[in-house]
Amino acid sequence: MINQMNRLILLFSLLLFFSTVSQAALEIDVSEGNLRPMPIAITTVIDKQNEQLGLGLDITKVIASDLAGSGLFYPINPKAFLEEVNSVDRNPNFNSWRVVNAEALFTAELISDNERFRINYKLWDTFSEKSLEANYLVFSKNKWRNVAHMIADTIYTRLTGEKGYFDTQIAFIAESGPKTNRMKRLAIMDQDGQNPILLTSGKDLVLTPRFSPNGKELVYLSYRNGQPQVYIYDIQSKQTYVVGTFPGMTFAPRFSPDGTKIIMSLQEGVGSNLFEMNLSNFDRKRLTNTSDINTAPSYSPDSRNIVFESDKSGTQQLYVMDAGGDNVRRISFGTGSYSTPVWSPRGDYIAFTKISKGRFMIGVMFADGSGERIITDGFHNEGPTWAPNGRVLMFFRESPGEDGGAMIYSVDITGYNERKIETPGYASDPSWSALMN
Amino acid sequence: MVYKKALNLSVTFLLIFILTGCASTRKNVEQILFGGGNNNEAEIVSNAIPGSSQDFTVNVGDRVFFATNSTSLDDDAKAILERQASWLELYPEISIIVEGHADERGTREYNIALSAKRADIAVSYLESLGIAGDRVETVPYGKERPVAACSSEACWSQNRRAVSVVITEE
């Protein structure tokens, strides 16, 4: 069974490889029919003490939803199950799970003591009849969603060999009101769209939030003092502070991978240049010095390089330079313009927005510019952000017209398994956090 | 350039003369200065208080437009800015904010930078016409504040703009 999953991963890799070499037919190389999600039996979390709370069932649903949402797993309808699981301690009747085509089996039970809960869980390979994981988590009730996501991450990791991405959050801009005067508010939600929380009132225009590596802060653009400036929002304390005082507008901020620096653009005269700001001593370092628009910087995960966009060639194109600002080399050479580059947390790919023939696309290329591949193409797709495992992207898609607006989507980097994230209203500028726990 | 300056100066004097006069003569001057022969326009003109933001918007023209991804001022844009400069010379106590804007057909951060450039270029032109830099601020809005909401060139061309806004006393 595990071999089969490895084959699935291999298939993914091969598809990536082939779609990379045959650039001409990018969008159709990966079709759903090529991939068979692994059937998995996720039995309802046993909750003998507090069945009326429904917590066991809630956790079960979140785990199944996470795994199904990844596109790599197919949770089997519980109505098909032949065996009722009453205890995690007893070995299951593997044959009855193989009969319903389950290749993996998840069982769990909840034990509560006042406000503390403990979940014991196991993951089984139904063919080798071996336990792949046997573990427990202790939590308070309000953390049940995190616990479900953490367990789903564990299952994902055990069965794919990849790190998970379910116990994560998305920072985004919640939009409301007419297109000509849209209210924009800083917001966060769980990766699956649950628990949306508005962080700002909407009085000031805010844009482009990005998570700090530890998930505790957001760096973003706000018009609260009239001029657009880069601010940091502390999620726990709800405090906001401006990132340095600069003579002009600052924008396009991002944290360094270690969280100690901010890289951003400063508008000076007719050009915009890149600066790095040290958050401990507020030292600033100039990284570019031209009269072009140099913006949208993003560090490589090892902090050694920076990818950014510049219109110095006449159109927006992607460039990589050393973190100190030297050795600038252009990496995008296809038809059209390229912008919003973001380096994958794995270091392999750079995701971007591409504008060509009036269409807005999301794509990825290797960090040296080779292997460009378009993932989605349409009227307006913009602003990719990476899941912490570098396998999944989110971006926003804007619909045209007077009532048009933005919605956030997730998609596998193969282009497969695109899904809309349900948000209370229009939503844009997603930023994916690292794993929270 | 010298010729243009002289012309501006004469326009300025003419405006001073007229705008300090009564509203009925202003209407005629509108027609002389800006070719506003249209009666409806003249009607609006007569309602605006001289030196007000309405006067500026209606009688001078508060905005200039740009081609896609462009930050260059065409002749129409320059003519509007020249009228703005003349008006600002008439009212030296007035300051303005020049808002830069872009259409929705670009990525967010680039559009912010592009709209900043548009505002700056409009301001540079006003300064070249003698308007002191400390009377003019800029705010770039990128694609965040379109005036026209449709998704076609008819709207995008209206949204690629630099708008001069008269700062009014609170």
Regions found by a protein language model. Name each.
Chain B
Residues A148-S152:
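Short beta-alpha junctions and helix-cap segments that line functional grooves
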Residues M1-V11:
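Bacterial N-terminal signal peptides that target proteins for export
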